[in-house]
Curated annotation (Swiss-Prot):
Organism of provenance: Ictalurid herpesvirus 1 (strain Auburn)
InterPro entries (alphabetical): DNA-dir_DNA_pol_B (IPR006172), DNA-dir_DNA_pol_B_CS (IPR017964), DNA-dir_DNA_pol_B_multi_dom (IPR006134), DNA/RNA_pol_sf (IPR043502), DNA_pol_palm_dom_sf (IPR023211), DNA_pol_type-B (IPR050240), RNaseH-like_sf (IPR012337), RNaseH_sf (IPR036397)
Protein name: DNA polymerase
Localization (cell): Host nucleus
Pfam families in the record: DNA_pol_B
């Protein structure tokens, strides 16, 4: 608590002393690195691990004589029961004190009682409430009785805060709180060097384990069935219950958490550990340890070269251990010696397995000869090993036993409760329908709980385990899959772009089906595995070094007064800090109560003044936007964004929204001398008040109103005040001091915003309801304004912000931004013309921004008065049973005090601490609203009318999310580069034949697309629109000069030459922070942007349809438990093994059978559709060229949204219902077209075409038949959009035709004539010359082929561990064969043509890229050579080599061919059956002489098999 708090004054002698120490003090400084509240015997204590900042010695303090408090109102002190209670209770200290009763809203005199233990406090409270209950009274505390179980509150109340510096004299005895000294200035001085303190007390390290993958490869000595049943009893119980419930008709059961790789016994074969030693000086501080189990190794380990991995072999300390037990022992001993912050990636596996193995060795219920592992390792040894682990997690395990909470364990416990609950419901004597309804409610409740479960939490003492998998889960690090390899590359490269490649990704993956063999073989094989294991630990530590989680952890502790408990997010939430949100607010509010003297009742609140609301939570107000693309070109205007600063936190302060300030409307007679805000006066309000002001009668003759405080407002204001102080200090500091202030100001912001998220239900309702009210009030005020003859209106609003267009200036004229050069023009004249034009263009930009800023300042001044008056007029004074309204006089709000008749000023005390204000955020000169919470804007931050910052703001657009798919990212980037940044299309001869390049990045020489003729405008209409095209222009020079009149400004002069006409010209561009501003003064510039985007869209349509887009963008990842067994079984047929993977990659085929049939051109009876047929392994699908679905409909949606309403047969053109002046506004017309003709979520191309088809003016001219003109505009817009969509679809279909000329092979499980998963080149159409191969729209096939060969050559060394190249032979073709290269491709790559997989990492981006380039190179050869393509001599059709099920549907000829193939297979030396089902079938029916008659019926010449299910 603060030193100026009343409570501190009362307890000063029992708390650490606030002092200002001199330099010659004999006290030593200690940094409290870990703090725990414990009970030691009969005493409560605070245990502190501390770093002596003078000596670097780490010590442990045990602090007793603590302070636990309870208060009894003085009016009850003489009650006999209370007197007896006081006499019989051990009380450490007693004192009178005046506090504020947060429940009854009044100040009261109390007696403060201090106890040495929490048990004594609780016993006193319980007994006191028993006595006072009949009298209508309560025992009170400062709120700690609701939150003291985690240790935060005892630590807070005794002022011994974690991660702060205290002074004391060291001793070995126990301490009392008052033996510590706190010097705030010195504490802050030390904390400014926090990065230097952390390594001295936090010894960081990272580890990773490797286990035996296949259960049948495990050491059978470790197979103890008694331990297995004990460990997985719950799993077996759940399986039995699930089966029983399904038989009883229960549906919709959520997936069981008793699945996954942790739900089995494991054998750890190696553990790698990297010890950072950041506290040491000099190079090579890190120590590398690798512990490995030699028990089953056939040969000693032989080291392999590691220099290419940037590793120094001499620094790696390998420790061979004779079995798993000794390996764990060596590992834990090293942890205890060198590490107290342990990083791991996916603790749910690594830590879970470590603890499983420790439980195995410490298993007490073992029986004689239950397993050899238990015979070899006595129980006492196992118990001692477990104790060592516990001593690592807590340096004082005898006083504080550490806890590790796993999300999966919580889920399992709750899942079992769900199943038990369902069982009890089924046993009830109710109707089946009633039971099923109850069961559904329980299932829904479980599903909601599942999303909020704490994922991982480490609660030790002097030790933290940090799971970097959760720490990395942030918006700024969105990765397609959460693997360590993917995340490490993303993060390390982001922070260290020049980091050596081997240091940012895992070692080349070792195939999971070979991993066990490598470990057992020993030699160089195990060396590979051990280095692989070590690199995983190194990646984890490198991620941690960049993200600095310990700094983040401690800064959050400093901000919110929490002790060190590392929680790792909940459910699927992104990481937002180690301290739980509830703790951030809870502890801060506790501190506010201690500082302000606010107390709370500890039992049922008697005489409560408010009843909690029960209606559902509300969200913020989101106004449906006026959708469409807009430019602030001549006669059009900027979109202004106004927002409330920290809206929710500031409203909580302004209106004092907190549980202890709420009073029901019918109970105001019990609250005197307060002024409350009447919540019933706003829409969707409540019959409640919050106390905002109180009457100060210090001078009885002159009462006045002052602000009333609450614990919430105090907590929030503290965060807001400290953030302001840190931001101010940040501007005046540098280096580590600046880092300190910057980190803390950001922490204060996060903690401030957290208050709303964890607020009580009634408070939450008040906050969001008031937020809606404010935004709607501002929007209504905007509608009352009329500027430059035009009425204003809001066009979008979201929660705390509103957007509107500032008044347009219809007198604005177009400016030319291009100078045509005459052949004989002198350099001096050219320079003069360009200089004059540049000045004119820049001045136009400045004039427009100045007008915008002038309007905004005037508007804000007016709206501030409206908002203030709206709040104050709803205040009511409670006095003498009356409810008195305020009134306004002379610009000030007053209320009359009924006791004295004095006018009391309401305005001054209310406004003095007012925080929530509407402010000018930015102005957008380009914007596109697509739907609610979905928009892109080119925003400019203005200061005194001048641009000081320009950037693109994006909200809710899929192209920037991890859910983006296919071409979405490319299309979004095209939109940004061409429409928002401003740029041109550069022509290349390569695969990416048209490439958007912003003007900021354009260089000479280059060929760009520009106008075939200059646009001519009249009354906002481009007269020559139909004749304008974009044609190549040669960029001969690009000159760049600074533009000092615009911050971040640049003038760019682009010299263009058009070869057909021979004309030369210079394009002048005004840039701000790399974004072109020419649209502000030139509609021609806008047209160029739009035509460029339409052109690239048409190019993308063919490009994406032809499958030229990076195929990694269509690879999905799914968690293994969510994948059906059929898919997992299918990929094992390719000899792929899932191993320890958390997620499996896949691509999807076309969904419709008819589409597949049309692509593969096979009889539909030959095509089967097994379960999960649509999912395919990425590598197999890409190399073998299955009919992959490129999701072209997704591309169409990115361009046009979900579909055009106006093309439906039932469509009727709607009436244009907007009337008045607004009906002529361009954005209103666009919104009408979008909503009624297009769809509710139309996208980029539709908006571009719409804007191009509209007049360039802000308003349709009213000197003609406006209604007819608007209808004509709408008709033209819709027609252009429809024509554009048809053209795009045609190009897409043409590209897709090319793609499916090659990607048309039928996957094995879909071909009922061939159940072998071997690669068959005879059905690969890419290996045969073809007729009618479509040509390219853009690009040179020869150049593209050469590019692909070059890129594949560069990839070959990087995929050497993934694929093997062999000479073509039918015998070498197997289920792991990927494809056969065309002869020319193989020659040009200098590799044999047959490509075979060596690896299970079939989602690897490089492998997929290699397959993609093979396809493109193959397609280019087909385009170049057609039927004359050079091919292989493949020989005759060969057999499958596998005895499988007979065809389900076939002709007589096909059945005969199948039996011939079967005969060849049976003639092999060792024929094999496809599966157990096939084997059983042939054993039963194979010798039947009437096989065909019994197995088949003939229907219309087609043989149909009678037995449907054979193959498993």
């Amino acid at each position: 608590m603060d030193r100026n708090a009343v409570l501190y004054g009362v307890l000063e002698h029992r708390l650490p002393k606030w002092v200002e120490l001199s330099d010659d003090t004999d006290l030593e400084p200690f940094f409290f690195s870990s703090v725990r509240y414990i009970t030691a015997g009969s005493e409560d204590a605070i245990m502190i691990q501390a770093l002596n900042l003078n000596t670097d010695e780490i010590v442990v303090f045990l602090v007793t004589n603590l302070n636990f408090m309870a208060l009894i109102p003085t009016v009850y002190i003489e009650n006999p029961g209370i007197r007896q209670l006081i006499a019989s209770t051990p009380i450490s200290y007693r004192s009178p004190i005046t506090v504020f009763n947060g429940d009854l809203k009044k100040w009261m005199d109390c007696d403060l009682f201090v106890f040495g233990t929490m048990a004594a406090q609780k016993a006193f409270i319980k007994a006191g409430n028993s006595v006072l209950g009949s009298l209508g009274g309560n025992v009170y505390t400062y709120g700690d009785h609701v939150s003291n179980f985690d240790g935060n509150t005892p630590v807070l109340q005794n002022n011994l805060m974690c991660s702060h510096v205290y002074y004391t004299r060291y001793k070995t005895d126990v301490y009392a709180p008052w033996e510590f000294y706190y010097d705030q200035k010195r504490d802050q001085g030390y904390l400014m060097s926090l990065p230097a303190i952390i390594p001295r007390c936090k010894r960081e390290g990272a580890f990773d384990i490797e286990t035996i993958v296949h259960e049948n490869a495990m050491d059978q000595d470790l197979n103890c069935q008694k331990f297995f049943k004990s460990e997985f009893r719950s799993m077996e119980e759940s399986q039995v219950l699930i089966q029983r419930f399904r038989e009883a008709g229960v549906t919709g059961l959520p997936p069981s958490p008793f699945v996954g790789i942790t739900q089995k016994l494991h054998e750890i074969v190696s553990i790698s550990l990297v010890v950072c030693n950041y506290h040491k000086t000099g190079p090579k501080k890190k120590e590398y340890y690798v512990y490995y189990n030699t028990k089953k190794m056939e040969n000693p380990m032989e080291m392999i070269p590691v220099e290419h991995l940037h590793l120094d072999a001499s620094r790696i300390k390998f420790e061979a251990c004779k079995n798993e037990f000794y390996m764990l022992l060596a590992f834990i001993n090293r942890l205890r010696k060198s590490v107290n912050v342990l990083y791991v990636y996916n603790a749910q596996f690594d830590i879970q397995v470590i603890q499983q193995r420790l439980r195995y060795y410490a298993f007490k219920q073992r029986a004689p000869r239950c397993c050899k592992g238990h015979d070899d390792i006595p129980h006492e040894w196992g118990k001692a090993l477990m104790e060592k682990w516990e001593a690592f997690l807590s340096v004082k395990p005898q006083l504080f036993k550490a806890q590790i909470l796993m999300g999966q364990d919580i889920l399992k416990a709750n899942y079992l409760k769900l199943l038990e609950g369902i069982g009890s419901v089924l046993a009830q004597a109710k109707s089946t329908m009633a039971k099923m309804c109850t069961i559904k409610e329980r299932i829904d409740s479980y599903r909601k709980m599942k999303d909020t479960v704490q994922n991982f939490k480490s609660h030790g003492f002097g030790c933290d385990i940090i799971d970097m998998m959760y720490v990395c889960k942030r918006k700024e690090f969105e990765a397609k899959d959460g693997s360590l390899n993917t995340v490490a590359q993303l993060i390390i490269k982001k922070f260290k772009p020049h980091k050596a490649t081997p240091k940012i990704h895992k070692m080349d993956d070792i195939t999971y089906d070979k991993l066990d063999g490598y470990y057992r073989a020993g030699g160089t094989k195990i060396a590979e595995c051990l280095i692989y294991n070590l690199i995983d630990s190194l990646l984890v530590i490198r991620i941690a070094k960049n993200l600095k989680p310990m700094e983040e952890y401690i800064y959050r502790q400093l901000a919110c007064y929490n002790i060190d408990t590392a929680a790792h997010t909940r459910g699927v939430m992104n990481f937002c800090g180690f301290i739980q949100s509830t703790k951030v607010v809870e502890v801060s509010r506790n501190k506010a109560r201690l500082d302000a003297g606010i107390v709370m009742a500890t039992d049922y609140i008697r005489n409560s003044l408010f009843t909690p609301e029960t209606i559902p939570r509300r969200g913020g107000f989101v106004m449906a936007p006026l959708t469409g693309l807009f430019f602030a070109r001549p006669t059009q205007c900027f979109e202004l964004c106004l927002d409330f600063t920290s809206m929710y936190p500031s409203m909580m302060c302004d209106l004092n929204i907190s549980p202890e300030t709420i009073v029901d409307s019918d109970k105001t007679n019990r609250v005197g001398d307060y002024m409350g805000y009447d919540w019933s006066k706003i829409d969707q309000g409540f019959e409640k008040f919050t106390l905002v002001l109180r009457v100060d009668r210090t001078d009885p003759e002159n009462p006045k109103l002052v602000r009333h405080t609450s614990d919430t407002s105090l907590s929030l204001k503290r965060y807001l005040r400290l953030r302001t102080e840190h931001k101010r200090a940040l501007k005046q500091s540098s280096g580590s001091v600046a880092e300190y202030h910057n980190r803390l100001q950001n922490e204060m912001k996060i903690c401030t915003n957290t208050h709303y998220g964890v607020s009580e239900h009634t408070c939450s309702l008040m906050i969001t309801t008031q937020g809606q009210h404010k935004i709607k009030l501002v929007n209504e005020f905007i509608k009352t304004l009329n500027r430059t003859g035009h009425s204003l209106f809001p066009n979008y609003g979201d929660t705390d912000s509103t957007m509107l267009y500032h008044p347009s200036d219809e007198s604005e004229t177009q400016l030319e931004d291009m100078v045509t050069l005459e052949d004989e023009m002198r350099a001096e004249l050219r320079e003069y013309m360009l200089k004059k034009l540049s000045a004119e263009l820049v001045n136009r930009v400045k004039e427009k921004t100045k007008r915008t800023d002038t309007f905004v300042q005037s508007f804000l001044s007016d709206v501030e008065t409206v908002l203030f008056d709206d709040m104050v007029e709803k205040l009511r004074l409670f006095s003498q049973g009356e409810v008195i309204e305020p009134f306004k006089d002379g610009g000030t709000w007053w209320v009359v005090d009924p006791l004295t008749g004095i006018w009391m000023d309401c305005s001054t005390p209310f406004s003095s601490e007012l925080i929530c204000k509407l402010e000018y955020e930015n102005a957008s000169s380009i914007g596109c609203h697509v739907a609610k919470k979905m928009y892109l804007s080119l925003v400019h931050e203005l200061n005194n009318g001048e641009i000081i910052n320009t950037k693109i703001k994006k909200r809710g657009m899929t192209g920037f999310k991890s859910s983006r798919f296919g071409a979405t990212e490319s299309i979004t980037n095209d939109f940004m580069d061409l429409i928002f940044n401003g740029g041109a299309l550069v022509k290349t001869g390569h695969l990416e034949a048209l490439k958007p390049v912003t003007w900021a990045k354009l260089s000479a020489p280059a060929d760009i697309l520009h106008f075939s003729e200059p646009p001519v405008y009249e009354n906002g209409i481009c007269l020559n629109m139909n004749s304008i095209t974009l044609i190549p222009h040669r960029v001969t020079a690009v000159t760049r000069l600074p533009c000092p009149d615009i911050k971040g400004g640049e003038l760019v002069y682009v010299d263009l030459h058009e070869s057909t006409s021979g004309k030369s010209s210079v394009l002048v561009l005004v840039l701000a922070d790399g974004c072109a501003l020419n649209h502000i003064f030139s509609s021609a510039n806008v047209l160029h942007r739009e035509l460029s985007f339409e052109t690239i869209a048409m190019f993308r349509a063919f490009f994406v349809g032809a499958g030229f887009l990076d195929p990694n963008s269509i690879v999905f990842y799914e968690r293994i438990p969510r994948l059906k067994p059929e898919f997992l079984s299918k990929i094992t047929n390719y000899e792929l093994f899932t191993g320890k993977k958390l997620k499996i990659p896949f691509v999807t085929l076309h969904k419709r059978k008819t589409t597949i049939q049309a692509i593969v051109k096979e009889d539909k009876k030959q095509i089967d559709y097994p379960e999960e047929w649509i999912k395919q392994d990425p590598a197999m699908a890409m190399f073998r060229r299955y009919p992959i679905d490129l999701r072209l409909e997704r591309m169409i949606m990115d361009y046009f949204g979900s579909g055009l309403k106006c093309t439906l047969a039932t469509f009727t053109p709607p009436k244009y219902t907007v009337s008045g002046e607004r009906s002529r506004h361009s954005i209103v017309i666009k919104n009408h077209v979008d909503k009624h003709y297009l769809n509710d979520n139309s996208k980029f191309l539709a908006h571009v075409v719409m804007d191009r088809a509209m007049p360039t003016t802000c308003y349709i001219h009213d000197d003609i038949d406006v209604k007819a003109m608007i209808q004509s505009v709408i008709s033209r817009v819709v027609r252009m959009i429809q024509d554009t969509q048809v053209r795009l679809q045609e190009l897409s279909a043409a590209g897709n035709k090319l793609f499916h000329m090659f990607f048309n092979q039928l996957p094995p499980e879909m071909n009922n004539l061939d159940i072998s998963f071997k690669y068959n080149p005879l059905v690969d159409h890419a290996l045969q010359g073809q007729k009618g191969v479509p040509g390219l729209q853009y690009g040179n096939p020869e150049q593209i082929y050469t590019d692909m060969i070059t890129e594949m050559t560069a990839l070959l060394p990087r995929i050497g561990h993934m694929v093997e190249f062999m000479e073509w032979s039918q015998e070498l073709s197997s289920s792991k064969t990927l494809c056969l290269l065309l002869p020319k491709i193989a020659r040009d790559l200098n590799v044999p043509p047959l490509v075979t997989s060596l690896n299970d990492d079939t989602g690897n981006a490089m492998l997929i890229a290699f397959a993609h380039k093979i396809y493109i190179a193959t397609a280019m050869l087909h385009i170049l050579h057609g039927e004359n393509l050079e091919t292989h001599d493949l020989g005759p059709q060969t057999g499958t080599g596998v005895v499988g099920e007979p065809p389900k549907h076939c002709t007589g000829a096909q059945l005969r061919e199948w039996f011939i193939d079967l005969q060849k297979t049976l003639a092999l030396d060792a024929p094999s059956t496809h599966c157990a089902g096939c084997a059983d079938f042939w054993l039963t029916h194979g010798s039947d002489p009437n096989f065909i008659e019994k197995m088949y019926r003939v229907n219309g010449g087609v043989f149909v098999r009678k037995i449907k299910k054979i193959c498993l």
